[in-house]
């Protein structure tokens, strides 16, 4: 039989129970495994360790950088779907993830978190690195890359020159000029003191990260050296952590394939305008796409169209000229093979025509936006011009002329209202918008 408590003891019972529960919880916090503990109390270190592997920090300095890692660890970059490690992280199979970003934990704005390449491709690349040194599959990737002849040249270099990037598969470096490479170094955001064309302020770690990024995917470099704040059609680069980069958020163009006719006309008009600015600009750089799909373009919430993925963008310097890279297989090494087969042949700089990007867009994207949207005879004119614009056999002037005609047709098909905030209300008072 349970002993009976006196009045005073009975009165104290709720307090004793609370104290016992507190002591019990405290003792459990020293004895529970980490997996159970994380569900009771926020554990910064536990979340940090889990995040390192997912973000690829365990592979650094064979990574993009670490400039935005603190935001991840302070949970100032987060999503409703993966707020902390014990709630589960996104599937590894994705190349990008929507998230929210804050500088003060009060005001949040949408961002996208990108992998440079898929997790599967990263694993293949890492195995290639180990195999290049006849090392086990779980070798120190950084140690192997540091011992390469190319990186040893980088360590001695004071300036990034075309010979140091020859053989890399990135379209950005296919036809490099010294002016372009100086711009890469001067605007590289993953070092503390950017601004100089010389790499005196680069540590060994900084040089390896830059080389690795250029070898795997030049998308984050293009965001840094041609920023949207200066009028380039690219989203803002917010920083990198491990093998991920963070940039401002856009909706992929394919989400607008069923848009109303006036919105489709506006996006097509913008798309042609973007290609025109890449072909002709004040800095005399000619940008071209090696291939195109709808996921490479995105639309901000104000209706403005930008290049969402610049990994397939090449650059030719029309002012200074370019030095042909990778002649006769020269300077091919493990850095040349991280994302493609070492035997992959790249087109020569001279084979890149002014019409190349236009032809690709007119073949693959504009028909999905414009076909069957407008009444005759406007639709007939659009369809006819798309055939001319997408004909790779036609001379450059004919393709460029067809694109200009298409812009003239699309301009009056656009409407002026708040859906197009990037040009509203200016469009009410100025035909330019």
UniProtKB/Swiss-Prot annotation:
Q: Does the keyword Secreted apply?
A: yes
Q: Which organism is it from?
A: Homo sapiens (Human)
Q: Which family does it belong to?
A: Belongs to the DIPK family.
Task: Report what the protein is called.
Answer: Divergent protein kinase domain 2B
Coarse class of the protein's main subcellular location: secreted
* Leader sequence segment: 1-31
Pfam (any one)? PIP49_C
InterPro entries xrefs: DIPK2A/B (IPR020519), FAM69_kinase_dom (IPR022049)
Its localization reads:
Secreted
Carbohydrate attachment residues: 100
Keyword Flavoprotein tagged:
no
Which controlled-vocabulary keywords does the entry list? Autism, Autism spectrum disorder, Glycoprotein, Secreted, Signal
> GO CC terms on record?
extracellular region
Clinical condition linked:
Genetic variations in CXorf36 may be associated with susceptibility to autism.
Domain of life of the native organism: Eukaryota
């Amino acid at each position: 039989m349970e002993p009976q408590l006196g009045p005073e003891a009975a009165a104290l019972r709720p307090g004793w129970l609370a104290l016992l529960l507190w002591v019990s919880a405290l003792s459990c916090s020293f004895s529970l495994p980490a997996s159970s503990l994380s569900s009771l109390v926020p554990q910064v270190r536990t979340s940090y360790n889990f995040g390192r592997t997912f973000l690829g920090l365990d592979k650094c300095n064979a990574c993009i950088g670490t400039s935005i890692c603190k935001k991840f660890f302070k949970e100032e970059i987060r999503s409703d779907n993966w707020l902390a490690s014990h709630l589960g992280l996104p599937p590894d199979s994705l190349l990008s993830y929507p998230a929210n970003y804050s500088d003060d934990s009060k005001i949040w704005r949408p961002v996208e978190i990108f992998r440079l390449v898929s997790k599967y491709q990263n694993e293949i690349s890492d195995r290639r690195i180990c195999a290049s040194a006849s090392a086990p599959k779980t070798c120190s990737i950084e140690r192997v890359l540091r011992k390469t002849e190319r990186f040893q040249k980088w360590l001695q270099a004071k300036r990034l020159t075309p010979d140091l990037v020859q053989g890399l598969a990135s379209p950005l470096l296919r036809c490099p000029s010294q002016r372009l490479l100086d711009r890469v170094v001067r605007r590289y955001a993953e070092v503390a003191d950017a601004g100089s064309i010389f790499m005196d302020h680069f540590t060994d770690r900084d040089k390896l990260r830059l080389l690795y990024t250029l070898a795997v995917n030049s998308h984050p470099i293009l965001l840094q050296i041609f920023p949207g704040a200066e009028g380039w059609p690219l989203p803002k680069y917010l920083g990198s952590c491990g093998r991920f980069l963070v940039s401002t958020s856009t909706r992929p163009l394919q989400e607008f394939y069923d848009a109303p006719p006036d919105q489709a006309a506006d996006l097509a008009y913008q798309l042609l305008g973007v290609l025109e600015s890449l072909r002709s600009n004040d800095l005399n750089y000619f940008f071209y796409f090696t291939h195109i799909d709808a996921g490479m373009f995105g639309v901000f919430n104000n209706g403005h169209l930008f290049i969402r993925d610049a990994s397939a963008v090449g650059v030719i310097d029309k002012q200074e000229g370019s030095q042909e890279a990778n002649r006769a297989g020269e300077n091919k090494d493990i850095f040349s093979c991280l994302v493609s087969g070492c035997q992959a042949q790249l087109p020569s700089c001279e084979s890149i025509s002014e019409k190349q990007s236009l032809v690709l867009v007119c073949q693959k994207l504009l028909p999905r936006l414009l076909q069957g949207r407008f009444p005759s005879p406007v639709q007939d004119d659009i369809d006819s011009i798309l055939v001319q614009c997408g004909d790779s056999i036609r001379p450059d002037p004919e393709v460029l002329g067809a694109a200009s005609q298409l812009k003239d047709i699309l301009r009056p098909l656009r409407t002026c209202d708040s859906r197009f905030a990037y040009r509203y209300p200016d469009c009410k008072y100025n035909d330019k918008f």
